Amino acid sequence: MPSKTKYNLVDDGHDLRIPLHNEDAFQHGISFEAKYVGSLDVPRPNSRVEIVAAMRRIRYEFKAKNIKKKKVSIMVSVDGVKVILKKKKKKKEWTWDESKMLVMQDPIYRIFYVSHDSQDLKIFSYIARDGASNIFRCNVFKSKKKSQAMRIVRTVGQAFEVCHKLSLQHTQQNADGQEDGESERNSDGSGDPGRQLTGAERVSTAAAEETDIDAVEVPLPGNDILEFSRGVTDLDAVGKDGGSHIDSTVSPHPQEPMLTASPRMLLPSSSSKPPGLGTGTPLSTHHQMQLLQQLLQQQQQQTQVAVAQVHLLKDQLAAEAAARLEAQARVHQLLLQNKDMLQHISLLVKQVQELELKLSGQNTMGSQDSLLEITFRSGALPVLCESTTPKPEDLHSPLLGAGLADFAHPAGSPLGRHDCLVKLECFRFLPPEDTQPMMAQGEPLLGGLELIKFRESGIASEYESNTDESEERDSWSQEELPRLLNVLQRQELGDSLDDEIAV
């Protein structure tokens, strides 16, 4: 690589538009030094990702097997890529056998792909196809420098271009040679007075003969190219011999068309013809048979497509039927659950009605209790106490000492409850001081018991929410003493919640 100077800051070696080597150098071969990592058979790659993956897999497998890299010399030419093992020469050994040192050799047209690893630019590889087995083989190499690997890859790519140009030149030269030969044959044929065919007729006849040979399709495996070249060689020989052979072929059968006579001219033996195609079979019939065969193949393919679509529709119908059955099973399960819930609800309604009938039978007023009343009602009617009612044990009144001495509240008494829904209010009318002895003789005190009234909906009229109730209940137990003075034991609460009792 030329060194960069002050006026040469651009490296043309990395420019893909500029060729690396002269095209004449590929005739002799361009040599590179590298290290051979290894080779493995790979399936036909479809993308660069698969190629890079195969390259890395080969590297890791050979590294795991502890196989050392070999120093090789890579020769790139128009003949192909040749890999030769590089060894030091011994002093006594003047020459060596190149076949023993040859590692591999692949022609250019069999090389499938050449590239380097994007992660490690020193690693490059090419994939070649084996001519005998058509197996793709990946060969991995490693160079000393990244630039060297890039030059090798670009050199192999340039060898493709050079071979393509050479093939185009060869085809053009062959075409020119054929045109020159035809012009010479035309000039020779025009000088022969006994010749009946002109040059244009010969060209059309040759075209018809070649078409007829292709239409015959001789069933000889592997000899299609040889048969075609042999026919062309016979045609050239006929043109060189002159018109005597053609006249001798055409004159015994003056009424026979040219197309039926041409296979006899080109094909040496009649045994190579198919048994179904005779000399009198017209060419159009054969083409019609080919057309019918192609139409039949097309119909078969369409039938296969239709069958595949039918199978797909059947699968879709089966999936939809399974989904529908599953949905029906779920709906049936939901219906059963709904039925059980309805039965349970009807049972609850019957129980509620029985409770209402029992309560209405005990009620003297005949009022109908609501569901909320039945829910909150217990066996012993609870008592609701206000926060302002003083507690009985904290009262210090000498007037009530004798009256309360013989009064004891049982455990189930409404007066022994704190969390209750009955409101007791006591009020007393204190007589003058001169009448206090009369009260001590056993006159009853005046008190009041007020029950909370319920609406038909079951909601209390005085306390609208449960939160207020709970707050007031807490305040009853923590605030002032209750105002309950005395309730006689012989008096009982009413049966109905709508009644007010005054004692």
Swiss-Prot record:
PDZ-binding (motif): residue ranges: 501-503
Keyword Coiled coil on entry: yes
Stretch list, region Disordered: 170-212
One function term, GO molecular function aspect: nitric-oxide synthase binding
Coiled-coil portions: 318-359
Subunit structure: Interacts with the PDZ domain of NOS1 or the second PDZ domain of DLG4 through its C-terminus. Interacts with RASD1 and SYN1, SYN2 and SYN3 via its PID domain. Forms a ternary complex with NOS1 and SYN1. Forms a ternary complex with NOS1 and RASD1.
Protein known as: Carboxyl-terminal PDZ ligand of neuronal nitric oxide synthase protein
